[in-house]
Amino acid sequence: MKPQVLIEKMNESERKAFDSLGRYKFEMFGYWSSTWVKYNQLAFDMGIIDKKNPNPFKDLVNQAKNITDEA
């Protein structure tokens, strides 16, 4: 796979994840967000990027943790 194609796929996965979440498609959000994580790992392992990109879903994860801690 060409480096630029992998980066484009990673960007597409992020867009689709947030789009899915915004439309209450939670299962598809999980699919696309995990795809982004995998592409990020592949890009790093293949030397396409020097270090992993920050996870764009981290704030959502932290918010979910805060909600469950309050319950």
Show where each model-derived region lies.
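C-terminal-biased regions
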Residues: 1-22, 27-71
